[in-house]
Amino acid sequence: MRNIVVVQCKSTGINYIQDIIDRNCNPVILEMNAFSDTEEAEMHLKEVRSGYNLINADYDLIYEKDTYEETLEMVKKLDPLVIVPGTEDGVILATKLANDLNLLCNPIENLDAITLKNEMHKRLAENNLRSIRGRIVTSVEEAIEYYDSQHLDEVVIKPQYSFCSVGVRICSNKEEMIKSLHELFNSTNAYGTELDELLIQERIRGEEYVVNLMSCNGVHRVTTIWKYHKIKTHEGGHVYDYDETINELGIGEAELVEYAYDVADALGIKYGPVHGEYMIDEKGPVLIEVNCRPHGGNLDAKFLDRISGQHETDSSLDSYLNPDKFHQDRQMPYKLYAHGVLKSIIVPKDITAKSSPLQNIGKNLKSHHRTLIGQIEDSQFFLKTQDIETSPGDIYLVHEDKNQVMKDLEFLRSLEQRAFQLVLSEETHENANIDDLSYLNDIKSIVNNLKPYGTILLVTDTFFDDLSIVQTDAEGLDKIDGEFDCVLINLNKSIANESDEKIAALLLKTLKTVKVGGGIYIPKTTYDHIPNGRLGAEALVKFMNFKIELPVHKLPRMLIASKR
């Protein structure tokens, strides 16, 4: 059985492992050393290792040696069939190893052009392709000189070698540029290496796309096209909001694909995946950056297969091992079978979260494929989101109906903006003091008002002997069969010390007991205990396809909603 080596197996690159096994080969992960002795570099390595938990297959694991020569000798003994990078930081080492072992790969002379952002654009300019003006600077003074000499206005600052939007700053003027440079020159890149040089580029305004290509001996084909939607933070960071698939080409997008082919040719890319990020403005398409590895974002094979009937790592192996299959796929028209969205979670401020209600909420979305957030033990600190590294996780949506995907996406975005405690909860909601006599009388009065409307379920902490309706506490909810015309929730003391994750799950379970056309009634004495209070309760009922009804004059404060 031949070995196939995956250098730095992370994110979507994890899919390589099963694909290698499916080709009757043995997967070998080559784990790279930390890029430096900084805390950030150690955290990056820890993140790489945590990704192994997502691999449900057997593989061999080897480690980079102290010198390149030792690493090369170790890999040579494996007699590998192919060496591929599993993520961006594995591209350089994988390319060097494959070249030195005379394996199919991208030419070593093009390594700078496919890994260093400034070199990419130099190569495009040399080939008379549209590129972005920019310069590598090593000081704030050098950046100011370049800014003034080029008569720049808005600029983008980014590390020369990094990935996604890590370390990227968008600056509206010189003052913002200077401030961002001072911050970045005192920081590290995505791999924990100190930033002693930065790339200053003119800003291109437009719509941002990804064109994923696959290359076989310099011939390219499209696998998927995505559109990015980002948000600029107050600090100038560039935050991913969501990515969506392009299922049919719109105006200007065919030209984008042609330009992507030209870029791959100019950079001398011969084999494997080409993850290219582009902008389209009034002048047409222009490259932002290209990465010779699979699309990131932890896109699992089942998610991608449902969207396009293929996934990149499998198609990548075709480009090396099965060129006939590659060329057969290349002749097929571009067709996606479902619409996909990757929603990145945006944390609005530094928080210490104690639970993640979104874990349970997300499962109820009709287009939900997966929610990827680390399990919170006791509590976990999350930084305000500034880039992809400070996003705590992602939600994956896929459905044949685009309207359903976008509806679920808008719900998730509304949670972020209006009821973030339903995403990551600090468990800080105040449990109001309740006048037992007053509120219990209110509950009985509400029940009596509801009797003309049909069957009633009371989910309650306190049972009422004088009410002839079905009553249950939270623990007994699983034993309730059937659906009711009216469901009234009277829970407060019993949920006061529960996690927001459990409270949200309990409310969702209760909402399922309401008939179509029936109503849910949540008084203030209950919704005060729900994450984000009334807004959180409203978000959950809207999520379950309830219509929020007008409040009724003279009734106690209450959320009323009807099931559609």
Mark where each language-model region is.
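ATP-binding N-terminal substructure of ATP-dependent carboxylate-amine bond-forming enzymes
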Residues: M1-E109, E141, E389-T390, E400-R413, ...
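A short glycine-rich, Lys/Arg-flanked "PGG" loop and its adjoining helix->strand segment in the class I
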Residues: K502-V516
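Conserved beta-strand signature within the Rossmann-like core of class I S-adenosyl-L-methionine
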Residues: G517-K524
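Peripheral (often C-terminal) accessory segments that flank ATP-dependent C-N-forming ligase machineries
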Residues: L317-I434
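ATP-grasp fold ATP-binding core
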Residues: L124-A125, D148-I170, N189-G206, V211, ...
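A conserved helix-loop-beta module that forms one wall/lid of the active-site cleft
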Residues: N99-G167
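Conserved ATP-binding module of the ATP-grasp superfamily
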Residues: R130-I132, E154-I157, C171-G206, G236-Y242, ...
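Active-site "cap" helix and flanking loop/linker of ATP-utilizing ligase/carboxylase catalytic domains
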Residues: E255-H275, D281-E282, N291-D350
